[in-house]
Amino acid sequence: MTDLTLRRATAADDQVLAVLAARLSAFELPAWRAPHEIADADSRAMIAAAASGNPDDEVLIAERGGEVVGCLHVLAVTDFFGLRHGHVSVIATTEAAEGSGVARRLMEHAEQWTAERGLPLLTLNVFAGNARARRFYEKGGFRIEMVKYAKTVNSQPPTSKGQGTPNSQSPNETPNS
């Protein structure tokens, strides 16, 4: 099997980042979340981060044998409690790369990236319905810290349209610039 290489994403990767972002909703979602909104928001965030040049915001492309097989977006954020830490905003692999070690290698990079910056913690968010990802994270040593509950309160399902720009952080996290 060909070795896996990681490289920084460039503007030439915009299309492949959009395709990989679509994988982030390849499981049962809450009724108020639309797959295209998730893919659009995450691909926009990755494309912007790749173009920013911010050293505390990195987007990587994983390649094997010249083919793109995954991506990672990791950044430094400050949580609600004031703790600056690493945060995996996006990790995605192609369907063909599932179970081949690509995601594990990307997570190893995220951990190393976080440690190199002297940050004490690495966090991520995952939808409750993404059982495969949750098992992967737990096997990698991640533990549940907080559970977010949501409830629709009117007949109109929530949407991100008209409610500000979606971003890759949870509401209690802000990127560090």
Residue ranges and their predicted role:
Residues 104, 116, 128-146, 151:
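Conserved active-site alpha-helix within GNAT-family acetyltransferase domains
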Residues 97, 101-109:
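Conserved acetyl-CoA pyrophosphate-binding loop and the N-cap/start of the following alpha-helix
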Residues 1-12, 154-155:
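Conserved N-terminal entry element of GNAT/NAT acetyltransferase domains
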Residues 107, 114-125:
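Conserved GNAT acetyl-CoA-binding A-motif
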Residues 25-48:
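Conserved GNAT-fold acetyl-CoA-binding loop/helix
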Residues 61, 67-76, 92:
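Conserved beta-strand in the GNAT
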Residues 48-61, 87:
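A short helix-loop-beta-strand connector motif used in the catalytic cores of GNAT acetyltransferases and
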Residues 88-98:
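A short, internal acetyl-CoA/4′-phosphopantetheine-binding micro-motif in the GNAT/acyltransferase core
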